[in-house]
UniProtKB/Swiss-Prot annotation:
This is Leucine--tRNA ligase. The keyword Protein biosynthesis applies. Gene3D superfamilies: 2.20.28.290, 3.10.20.590, HUPs, Isoleucyl-tRNA Synthetase, Domain 1. Its main location: cytoplasm. The keyword Protein biosynthesis applies. SUPFAM superfamilies: Anticodon-binding domain of a subclass of class I aminoacyl-tRNA synthetases, Nucleotidylyl transferase, ValRS/IleRS/LeuRS editing domain. Disulfide bonds: none annotated. It comes from Burkholderia ambifaria (strain ATCC BAA-244 / DSM 16087 / CCUG 44356 / LMG 19182 / AMMD) (Burkholderia cepacia (strain AMMD)).
Amino acid sequence: MHERYVPADVEAAAQGDWRAADAYKTREDSQKPKFYCVSMLPYPSGKLHMGHVRNYTINDVMYRYLRMNGYNTLMPMGWDAFGMPAENAAMANGVPPAKWTYDNIDYMKGQMQSMGLAIDWSREIATCKPDYYKWNQWLFLKMLEKGIAYKKTGTVNWDPVDQTVLANEQVIDGRGWRSGALVEKREIPMYYLRITQYADELLNDLDGLGWPERVKIMQQNWIGKSFGVNFGFPYELDGEKALLRVFTTRADTILGVTFCAVAAEHPLATRLAQGKPELQAFIDECKRGGVAEADVATMEKKGVATGFSVSHPLTGEPVEVWIGNYVLMSYGEGAVMGVPGHDERDFAFAKKYGLPIKQVIASEGQTYSLDAWQEWYGDKETAVCVNSGKYDGLRYADAVDAVAADLKAGGYGDKQVTWRLRDWGVSRQRYWGTPIPIIHCPSCGDVPVPEQDLPVVLPEDLVPDGSGNPLAKSEAFLNCSCPKCGAAAKRETDTMDTFVDSSWYFSRYTAPDADTMVDARTDYWMPMDQYIGGIEHAILHLLYSRFWTKVMRDLGLVKFGEPAKNLLTQGMVLNETFYREDASGKKTWYNPADVTVTHDDKGRPVGATLNTDGQPVVLGGIEKMSKSKNNGVDPQVLIDQYGADTARLFTMFAAPPEQQLEWSGAGVEGASRFLRRVWSFGATNREALATRAGFDAAALGDADKALRREIYSVLKQADFDYQRLQYNTVVSAAMKMLNAIDGAKGATPAVLRETYGVLLRVLYPVVPHVTFELWKALGYADEFGPLLDAPWPKVDEAALEQAEIELVLQVNGKVRGALKVAKDASREAIEAAAVADEAFAKFSDGKPAKKIVVVPGRLVNIVV
């Protein structure tokens, strides 16, 4: 072996052995417990970032540790390969999205392989391949048969210049991101999946999951089960009687209603706008806004009075109807009751437009004011009804019951459970996605593609130009025959939401070569024992994948109803930011690698200059690594300079997996230095470490016993930390081990070999290359087999036994020394040894002991 640690050589050698042995190809094995661990599959954007490195290293460490502990472990990988970024890149570069995607996959796969990840590449999938998305289409048709998939009109963002539908993130300040045109809302037919049919189960099954509480709460809030009252305000228009329906969780405030607001798309708004240009103009303005709930939450709340009133169902008083830009047709009934006295948004709206504000609940001892909103105005915990006639004095629950009963008696409504969750719209008016398997026949209508004709293959040679969906212009794709009548027909040009692709890929990993969607192997591996990904996926991806899994179960495809038993949401990777700001306020961000930082005597940054010109830059603080802030670290540069093991070691040591990781160049250098020490010890002591002589543990000398005691004590802690996924303290334990071994004076070669072998196995899951090569070079592989399959070291409990123990010696409560006594010494023997110790003679001033306090195994305190 080389004297010097050369990461590139070490890692190339280890990876060569792993490839030759096909070391990570995994098969089902009923004789072993299984452990299926999956990192959320990446989008092939071009290059890995440090967030990827951290995620996959966590997965890899888990895999290797559990494989050493006898588990049949599986770590697969794939590519979430459809999506809008590929179309954008295609437009920018004039190449088909397919070429851009496959080139990126090739590069990123090479990066993963250079990290030494234990991936079974025989299971690799790419969601843009027909053999994968065929099953998206197949299950969609099954859901169509069962009524889970259905078609209805939905609202989208329409760019009138580019003549295309825009995703919410492509609408910037109400304008199309490419054309700059004012975006319009349009109603178009789309396909939906009835996720609401599973709302109760999705909510209730959260209790049995080993997921972070934060994620569970986010899903609970998104599902949003609400108990309230659905009722209507009666009105008459053009001789027709009807109800303007609303849903409220605050029926106790119903007598505080001073207006109603409806969405711009509400049928009543459409009717009232006829012949009224000012109303129609406002409706058109609303339709130009984004359709995302987040957009509505942050936009300025605007409204216009219709001049029309409905009647209050309990008092008969007129209630003015407004059209509001903050009311979404897709949520609730598309109408809301306005109670400005007890709702902050309604309060602001009423103040803006001079609408009446009525107080109908009050808390004792609190004064109501119209000057500004106060949090307690909507309090339902302590408030009671006031100014509400027969309901006065009732608390929230009793008031809701009474109001609901009266509304029901009048035929206006009743109690209702509602959900914030809405059915999942899966139609996307985009090219680079799974084609929806529907054919439009002029005679037969919408006809599902027959199962034997799947997949409907997406042409991969089209180049989007931003003016509509390329599929609509592709005669070869578009034109077909109706499966029912044989007449000329057209294919559906919408593609599926890319969340469909990522809703079941983990099941396909288990049977990637199956000629069915899944097979018996899926029930062996699934559900995932551990899923790893960012908190940003807490709602949509994780909720949709839970729904998709339940549908697959109900169709008899699988036996499980949840995709993942446990979830780990790794923390973000942070780094320093630096910028300069020009006269217009525009900021230019500089990568930390291009900046020199000065620090004060306490190590705090106090200034920074750009390396190219020596001029100052502003310290922008520590933020998440991102392209926008130019504060990322290229993993490939790191691997090329220090090696993959250093990158892995630093990302595991710098912080616990679930916490944020702050990047540190000094920390990376420290990780590299530690690995050089591990290697150097092995190289320097290779003759001693190659000694295979056995030993009698009972006959060992003090130095050997002390070293073994230290190593096995630390091993016990490291094992515990591996089990609780605290890999940072595992690395700390390994550092303690190396210090103990390196500093052991008088230890015999046989014990050095034993303890160094323990160190290599403890470190192996984190830094597999250097430990694998040392294990082989020092002869451990000849004795125990390759480190890949070496068993996890067992703690020698006998080595932890001590003939003597050390107690703290105190005199009058102050530490004055240490006292060594036999482990099984009696209290009397301990007291005698304490008063005989020279420390007592020195600090007692010749006074006799009045009292001796013995805390077994810890200390002796002599009171004089």
